[in-house]
């Protein structure tokens, strides 16, 4: 059951607002997984510059379970952030962030891909256990839809949005590896939305191979 675990590092995928609907994978399961792993560091999907912000601010921009983890564990374990929301916001509050306003669901091919993704979320992630949610075959299905979506988006002139998503994931990976490197020998649990799990785990594996570990 040591899914997505390598030596002292564990990557745990979460399902954001679906935790409120999925009785098999609630915040209690996240809490238990953290306690069971006994980490020295908890890395969550919040920008590190926002870690010290109040909940009233965070709740508008970040997944609820990330805020709950921060609130519950920051007084007993080191909690750090590894998210990224764009170069323009490097030292800016996140309220200046302007996500894409384009309504892309009006295009049938995009709409069909979004429906396929939503069906997986509804059929699987609303009922799966914490262990089933980390299942690689299901994550690969979502990844495949994302790749197809990017091809279609490119056809609608959305190259900037695709680049932003790629940059975000790459920098999240860089930030994660820096946290691990800066805390060499310590136990680190990385908590992220399920759609980032495969990428981050691959980055972790590659970094270990390069270090001949």
What is each PLM-predicted segment?
Residues 9-10, 186-192:
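Generic beta-sheet signal
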Residues 15, 194-195:
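Active-site metal-binding loops of divalent metal-dependent hydrolases
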Residues 196-213:
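C-terminal domain-boundary segment and adjacent tail
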Residues 2-35, 49-51:
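Zymogen propeptides
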Residues 34, 38-44:
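Proline-aspartate-enriched helix->loop->beta-strand connector
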Residues 12-15, 45-47, 82-85:
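Active-site-proximal beta-strand/loop segments in catalytic clefts of secreted hydrolases
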Residues 10, 80-82, 212:
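General small-molecule cofactor/ligand-binding pocket signal
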Residues 41, 50-185, 194, 202-203:
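Hydrophobic, often amphipathic alpha-helical segments used for membrane interaction and targeting
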């Amino acid at each position: 059951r040591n899914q997505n675990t390598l030596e002292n590092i564990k990557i745990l995928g979460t399902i954001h607002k679906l935790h409120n609907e999925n009785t098999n994978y609630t915040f209690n399961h996240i809490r238990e997984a953290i306690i069971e792993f006994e980490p020295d560091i908890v890395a969550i999907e919040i920008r590190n510059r926002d870690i010290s912000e109040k909940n009233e601010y965070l709740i508008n921009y970040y997944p609820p379970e990330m805020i709950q983890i921060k609130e519950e564990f920051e007084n007993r374990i080191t909690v750090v952030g590894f998210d990224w929301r764009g170069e323009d916001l490097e030292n800016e509050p996140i309220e200046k962030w302007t996500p894409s306003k384009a309504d892309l669901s009006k295009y049938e091919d995009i709409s069909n891909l979004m429906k396929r993704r939503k069906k997986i979320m509804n059929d699987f992630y609303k009922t799966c256990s914490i262990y089933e949610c980390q299942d690689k075959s299901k994550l690969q299905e979502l990844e495949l839809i994302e790749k197809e979506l990017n091809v279609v988006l490119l056809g609608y002139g959305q190259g900037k949005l695709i680049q932003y998503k790629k940059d975000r994931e790459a920098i999240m990976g860089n930030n994660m590896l820096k946290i691990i490197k800066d805390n060499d020998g310590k136990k680190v649990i990385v908590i992220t939305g399920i759609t980032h799990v495969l990428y981050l785990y691959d980055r972790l594996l590659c970094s270990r191979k390069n270090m001949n570990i």
